[in-house]
Amino acid sequence: MSMGAVRGFRTDEIDEEEMMKARAAYFACGDYLDEIIGDFLALLKRDGLLDDTIVVYTTDHGELAGEHGLFWKNTWHEAACRIPLIFSLPEQRRGELTATEITAPVSLADVFPTLCGLTQT
């Protein structure tokens, strides 16, 4: 059975209440992630490690939460394949380096070489 045949993949296969519950759970996960990242950064700061830490935030895929009439990640729609890739450097946080936004597509395969370049290893 293809993933498209699984009940709940398309929004016309679930009722409005189920869709609202699914969206609420999805957004609650984002809120929780924001909270624990904040807690983690606070611990790094408390322990004097934040000034020597490169923080990288990314994910392996996006998610559809009803956009295009679909749920899950199994499409090439932008919401499923365009993901955050954020590097937070000590120099940026100290105001010594201006943050730059790169809008061109990148790959997660770029993360390791980028970290090696930043740490000169």
Whereabouts are the PLM-identified features?
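Core domains of carbohydrate- and sulfate-ester-processing enzymes
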Residues: 1-14, 84
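A short beta-strand-to-alpha-helix junction
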Residues: 23-33, 75-83, 94-119
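Histidine-centered active-site microenvironments of extracellular/periplasmic hydrolases
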Residues: 42-97, 107
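Short alpha-helical functional segments enriched in proximate histidine and acidic residues
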Residues: 36-43, 64, 114, 118
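Conserved hydrophobic/aromatic pocket- or pore-lining residues that grip, position, or stack substrates
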Residues: 1-3, 37, 55
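A long, amphipathic alpha-helix that forms part
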Residues: 10-53
